[in-house]
């Protein structure tokens, strides 16, 4: 029997109607709401979240999980208030949670006041969710004195506890930028795992829609992660492990375990299941599903890239470097996925047609950057899933680059830096993840390793963050000093510690603080500052403080 049942996906053609249920359902449906229904366990066990904030709108999220839930739809009530006692309710309503969407709830609030904090909660039967806190951003053109964001990535369940989020919550950020690898699709190793993932798949892999739903439910059971979601809105992008290690567009990657994934007969269906589960479990807008759920089955996009403005202080460009990319160039022995590659031996390395973002997203980003000066944003932050700057992994003679990152898509990287220069974008900042290491450095117009390119002034700064729990490996820790010396456009690197980053913006400067926990394998941790950097607006200089 095939791992994926195509008929199951083709039944999900009514997504558009389901997503707008709160507006279109007849009064007779709302009259069936059973406020006296008793639940044996908490249907809100996965917590609450909010995301995609604008100056007047934000998405509220929850997903019901309870043993008595079946294929029937459930009417969920929601409230938004000015205070956590809900004595001043500003909006309320009902939403239909359908089984076809995993009983997820996405409420897209509108007509909120700008630059305000709100409280929200959900109710079904006798159950009431935990209280979430969210906010809107200032209006376009508004003068904003300060903004604090945290960024994080790469949280593998079995390699540690998500205690970094407990410390992040204490930072009281205005928003969290999550930069990929929210879940991992691998089976757990009972020998080395700290805590094992569950899976309904006979292989122990995440392969089906139910598998993905269960994996998200497991990760979201972490109380520190839940609390951070409830504390402020999140802006999201993904990397590969939300689907499969090293996948590229509609090309399967490398499972690392007997090639179970790469031998699957229809990767498009597997990606569709992963994308649907991502939507079901994240506070993102319904417009991300550009051609409904049915479109995913035939390879349609799930558009998660977007621009979010915070008055005149900052514009955030949330990018998607995974969904539209070409296959990795010159992977060894014809293998799927990533390899370390010597570009001198790879004829495709500098092919100008190769893309990381895809033609449409590249065009969109260029257009957005072209209007950045007119918007007047002091800081222009591109948030994506991996290291942007060139990193040669061999000291001295010879070259070795990772073909799954931007190094493997050098012409696409050059097009982006050309756009930054062409449009004279103010204060470009690149944020990334993926490596499970901290790297801090300069954006270069040209990463060619000749003397002129190396001597040319920088055009922006980059902060690539470490992981929440995922390990970097002992060899990465050992080789970091020589890799840093080999790539002088970077000023700091560390592969030893897990944690997150905090960026504080003002009109005069940004301050980035790298925060690390002492031991992800302990349920109680301490947090320390690994390093702190200041960049003055208008000066592309990174100062360590």
List each model region and its residues.
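Metal-dependent phosphoester/phosphodiester hydrolase catalytic core
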Residues: 2-545
């Amino acid at each position: 029997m095939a791992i994926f049942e195509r008929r199951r996906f083709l039944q999900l053609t009514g997504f558009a109607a389901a997503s707008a249920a709160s507006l279109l359902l007849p009064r007779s449906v709302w009259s069936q709401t059973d406020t006296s229904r008793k639940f044996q366990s908490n249907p809100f066990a996965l917590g609450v979240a909010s995301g995609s904030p604008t100056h007047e709108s934000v998405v509220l999220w929850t997903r019901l999980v309870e043993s008595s839930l079946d294929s029937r739809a459930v009417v969920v009530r929601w409230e938004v208030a000015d205070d956590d006692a809900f004595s001043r309710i500003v909006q309320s309503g009902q939403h239909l949670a359908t089984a076809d969407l995993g009983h997820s709830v996405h409420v897209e609030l509108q007509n909120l006041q700008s630059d305000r904090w709100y409280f929200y909660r959900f109710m079904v039967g006798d159950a009431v969710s935990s209280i979430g806190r969210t906010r809107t951003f200032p209006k376009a053109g508004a003068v904003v004195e300060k903004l604090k964001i945290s960024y994080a990535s790469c949280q593998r369940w079995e390699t540690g506890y998500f205690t970094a989020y407990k410390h992040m919550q204490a930072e009281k950020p205005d928003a969290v930028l999550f930069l990929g690898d929210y879940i991992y699709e691998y089976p757990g190793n009972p020998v080395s795992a700290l805590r094992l993932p569950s899976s309904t798949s006979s292989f122990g892999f995440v392969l089906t829609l139910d598998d993905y739903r269960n994996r998200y439910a497991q990760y979201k059971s972490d109380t520190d992660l839940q609390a951070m979601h409830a504390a402020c809105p999140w802006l999201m992008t993904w990397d590969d492990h939300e689907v499969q290690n090293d996948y590229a567009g509609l090309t399967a990657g490398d499972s690392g375990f007997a090639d179970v994934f790469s031998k699957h007969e229809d990767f498009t269906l597997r990606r569709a299941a992963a994308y649907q589960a991502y939507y079901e479990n994240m506070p993102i807008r319904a417009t991300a599903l550009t051609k409904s759920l049915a479109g995913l089955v035939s390879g349609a996009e799930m558009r998660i890239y977007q621009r979010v403005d915070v008055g005149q202080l900052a514009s955030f460009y949330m990018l998607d470097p995974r969904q539209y990319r070409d296959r990795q160039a010159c992977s060894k022995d014809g293998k799927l996925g990533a390899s370390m590659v010597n570009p001198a031996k790879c004829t495709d390395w500098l092919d100008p047609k190769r893309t990381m973002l895809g033609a449409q997203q590249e065009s969109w980003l260029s257009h957005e950057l072209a209007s950045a000066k007119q918007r007047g944003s002091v800081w222009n932050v591109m948030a994506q899933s991996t290291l942007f700057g060139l990193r040669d992994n061999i000291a001295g003679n010879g070259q070795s680059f990772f073909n799954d990152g931007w190094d493997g898509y050098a012409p696409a990287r050059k097009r982006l830096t050309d756009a930054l220069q062409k449009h004279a974008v103010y204060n470009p900042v690149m944020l990334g993840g993926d490596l499970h290491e901290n790297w801090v450095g300069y954006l270069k117009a040209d990463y060619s390793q000749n003397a002129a390119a190396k001597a040319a002034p920088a055009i922006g700064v980059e902060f690539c963050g470490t992981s929440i729990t995922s390990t970097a490996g002992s060899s990465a820790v050992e080789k970091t000093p020589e890799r840093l010396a080999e790539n002088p456009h970077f000023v700091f690197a560390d592969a030893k510690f897990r944690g997150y980053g905090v960026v504080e913006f003002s009109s005069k400067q940004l301050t980035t603080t790298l925060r690390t926990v002492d031991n992800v394998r302990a349920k109680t941790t301490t947090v320390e500052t690994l390093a702190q950097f200041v960049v003055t607006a208008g000066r592309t200089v990174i100062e360590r403080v």
